[in-house]
UniProtKB/Swiss-Prot annotation:
All residue ranges annotated as the PPIase cyclophilin-type domain in the record: 21-185
Single annotated GO MF: cyclosporin A binding
Matching PANTHER family: PEPTIDYL-PROLYL CIS-TRANS ISOMERASE, PEPTIDYL-PROLYL CIS-TRANS ISOMERASE D-RELATED
Name this polypeptide is given: Peptidyl-prolyl cis-trans isomerase D
Keywords from the named record: Cytoplasm, Isomerase, Repeat, Rotamase, TPR repeat
Stretches that traverse the bilayer: none
One record GO biological process: protein folding
TPR repeat start-end pairs: 229-262, 282-323, 335-368
Species of origin: Mycosarcoma maydis
The keyword Transmembrane appears for this protein: no
Length: 398
């Protein structure tokens, strides 16, 4: 079946996985949803195993845990390869269980891993299928004949890419949990009209969530990438002005993914385009930082990451030109970055780092009343904490 054909074969089950990325909320209903077609016409036993693990709400595994993907995590992520989940008993790749018992046999190994976004069974060798699965993010022909391909992604390729791009630690495990918070089967109009329970994005965004799925030419076209980034920033600004902070942050983050296609601009990039590209990226990072502090709940780690990127870029590059306008913008952007990172540290109750950043902000914007107020508030908190400690110590020796 063609990877570009989004119409499922009649009779094949359509299931979904709704994900949560750490504490980050979905920007709209269904925006973190992966919709999958199961190849019941080719591998009915394997497809039924996955379908039931998506829909079961009562049956228990032999461990006494729910026989379901719900509340399990993606425990293994390897960029440019695959994302793996389905271990709902141990969450580390050593557990899981099928609806037929602990393991079941390979049904058909002739399916090809020839395109991205295929759904395939993870195993520990021949005939060791359980509940663990993986979704490919590139063609993986070396897996042919070893793993059962039993489905494909119909919708939510950007969600798969987002999982693929998360920060990982030892054993390729995501640093923050990527959890399947809900799962089930879709039928009726949601399938026939291909909405799949996903609320429509009404921002006018027609771009793929990740640039690698948009156009191969972008990697060699700085101008086209810049204009997509600019368009996405404008969409985000509109949502920000409407206080739709979750959607705005989604668009700012997406714009940065596109701009990151060119972390170092080619030497032949026109000077005005190079300057505009850098300015746009800094502006989006600063906006994303502010936006992350306004979402519910706030996302201080996202704010810190974006502010740190701005600070690193501005302080590692050559000094601003002698033009007063350039110098003013340089110090203004640095002040914003330090102030917003300080605000994120305050949200994390890390006043020591917040104080250091606020002092840096004041160095770059000596007359900024907001920075001064926050420093005063921080000093009051510090004094109150010291008084509390003194009172506690005095009681110990009274």
């Amino acid at each position: 079946m063609s990877s570009t054909n989004t119409t499922p074969k009649p009779g094949n089950p359509i299931v979904y996985l709704d994900l949560a990325f750490g504490s980050s909320p979905a920007s709209r209903p269904g925006s973190n949803r992966i919709v999958l077609e199961l190849y019941a016409d080719r591998v009915p036993r394997t497809a039924e195993n996955f379908r039931v693990l998506c829909t079961n709400t009562s049956k228990l595994a032999s461990t006494g845990q729910p026989l379901s993907f719900r509340n399990s995590i993606f425990h293994r992520v390897i960029p440019k390869f695959m994302i793996q989940g389905g271990d709902f008993t141990r969450a580390d790749g050593t557990g899981g269980e099928s609806i037929y018992g602990e393991k079941f046999q390979d049904e058909d190994l002739t399916g090809k891993h020839d395109v991205p976004f295929l759904l395939s069974m993870a195993n520990a060798g021949a005939n060791t299928n359980g509940s663990q699965f993986f979704i490919t993010t590139v063609p993986t022909p070396h897996l042919d004949g070893k793993h059962v391909v039993f489905g494909r992604v119909l919708k939510g390729k950007g969600v798969v890419r987002r999982v693929e791009s998360v920060e990982t630690v030892a054993s390729d495990r995501p640093k923050e949990d990527v959890k399947i918070v809900d799962c089930g089967e879709l039928t009726g109009d949601e399938v026939s009209n291909q909405t799949y329970g996903i609320e429509q994005d009404d921002t006018g965004d027609q771009y793929e969530d990740f640039p690698e799925d948009q156009d191969d030419k972008l990697e060699s076209d700085v101008s086209a990438t810049y204009h997509i980034g600019l368009a996405l920033k404008n969409m985000a600004n509109t949502q920000f002005s409407k206080a739709n902070f979750d959607i705005a942050l989604e668009k700012y983050s997406k714009a940065l993914r596109y701009l990151q296609l060119h972390p170092i601009l080619p030497e032949d990039t026109p000077a005005d385009l190079a300057a505009n590209y850098t300015t746009l990226k800094t502006s989006i990072q600063l906006n994303a930082c502010l936006c992350a502090l306004k979402t519910t709940p706030a996302q201080p780690r996202v704010a810190i990451s974006n502010a740190t990127a701005v600070i690193s870029n501005l302080t590692s590059n050559k000094a601003p030109s002698t033009e007063q306008a350039d110098k003013n913008k340089y110090h203004s952007d640095l002040a914003k970055a330090f102030y917003r990172r300080a605000s994120a540290y305050v949200a994390q109750k890390d006043d020591e780092r917040a104080e250091a950043d606020l002092k840096h902000a004041l160095e770059n914007a000596p007359e900024d009343a907001g920075v001064k107020r926050e420093l005063q508030a921080l000093a009051r908190r510090k004094e109150a904490k010291l008084k509390g400690m003194r009172a506690a110590y005095s009681k110990m020796f009274s």
